[in-house]
């Protein structure tokens, strides 16, 4: 498969894994007034990118992509378990599990998924989104660093979709916000690539509390 087409395919919002169903606490932040306009939305997303994703989620995903690309299945399975254990709330756990299951179903129906990858899927107790993303990158010949970029872009697009539905935020305003967030997106990728495993970690109290409160939110559009 052409590398560019494969990368666009992985990053596409049309990838049938249900990402549009989740806000990762953003809907609760909107409901509580923490995010109420483009400037507060920018601060929320920048903090998520630079203080949370770049320091733990992104380097952990990158490590899984590298393990899958190298065929280091022992490392991939250990990293997948670490990712599963790091889901701090019920909603975040269910989000990763559902999206991972959907991506697994998609991949297992495609000829590009090789036998070693199929065997890994069979061994994983609960394949979350991160290991499934890594195996998708392997199947489609996507370099680990590019797979990370696709994941970060997919995350940002989904968060912007939440804002457009819930804030609400117009399409033009969403594009201006995208332009404003591109430097943070690039910084998150660079930080993740430079982070050694001993440095992985984040304390995202706000995200965790928002996710917990969202479980009891009276009226909501999203599952997290």
Swiss-Prot record:
Localization (cell): Cytoplasm
Is Cytoplasm given among the entry's keywords?
Answer: yes
First and last residue of the signal peptide: none
The answer to whether the entry has keyword Repressor is no
Chief place where the protein resides: cytoplasm
Q: Which GO terms describe its cellular component?
A: cytoplasm
Q: Where are the transmembrane segments?
A: none
GO MF terms on file?
nickel cation binding
Alphabetized Gene3D superfamilies for the sequence:
Urease accessory protein UreF (1.10.4190.10)
Sorted alphabetically, the keyword list is: Chaperone, Cytoplasm, Nickel insertion
InterPro entries found in the cross-reference section:
UreF, UreF_sf
Name the domain of life. Answer: Bacteria
Question: One Pfam family from the UniProt entry?
Answer: UreF
HAMAP family the UniProt entry points to: UreF (MF_01385)
Task: Give a short account of what the protein does.
Answer: Required for maturation of urease via the functional incorporation of the urease nickel metallocenter.
Subunit comment: UreD, UreF and UreG form a complex that acts as a GTP-hydrolysis-dependent molecular chaperone, activating the urease apoprotein by helping to assemble the nickel containing metallocenter of UreC. The UreE protein probably delivers the nickel.
Q: Which family does it belong to?
A: Belongs to the UreF family.
Q: What is this protein called?
A: Urease accessory protein UreF
């Amino acid at each position: 498969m052409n590398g560019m087409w494969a990368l666009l395919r992985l990053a596409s919002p049309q990838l049938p894994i249900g990402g549009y169903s989740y806000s990762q606490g953003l809907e609760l932040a909107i409901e509580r007034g923490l995010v109420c306009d483009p400037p507060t939305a920018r601060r929320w997303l920048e903090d998520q990118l630079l203080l949370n994703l770049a320091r733990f989620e992104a380097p952990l995903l990158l490590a899984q992509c590298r393990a899958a690309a190298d065929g280091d299945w022992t490392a991939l399975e250990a990293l997948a378990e670490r990712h599963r254990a790091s889901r701090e709330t019920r909603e975040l756990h269910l989000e990763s599990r559902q999206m991972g299951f959907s991506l697994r179903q998609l991949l297992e129906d495609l000829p590009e998924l090789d036998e070693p990858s199929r065997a890994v899927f069979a061994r994983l107790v609960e394949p979350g989104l991160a290991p499934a993303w890594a195996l998708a990158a392997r199947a489609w010949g996507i370099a680990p660093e590019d797979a990370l970029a696709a994941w970060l872009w997919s995350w940002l697009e989904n968060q912007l979709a939440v804002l457009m539905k819930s804030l609400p935020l117009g399409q033009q305003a969403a594009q201006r916000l995208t332009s404003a967030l591109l430097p943070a997106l690039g910084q998150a990728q660079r930080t993740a690539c430079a982070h050694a495993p001993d440095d992985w970690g984040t304390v995202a109290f706000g995200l965790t509390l928002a996710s917990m409160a969202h479980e009891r939110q009276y009226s909501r559009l999203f599952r997290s």
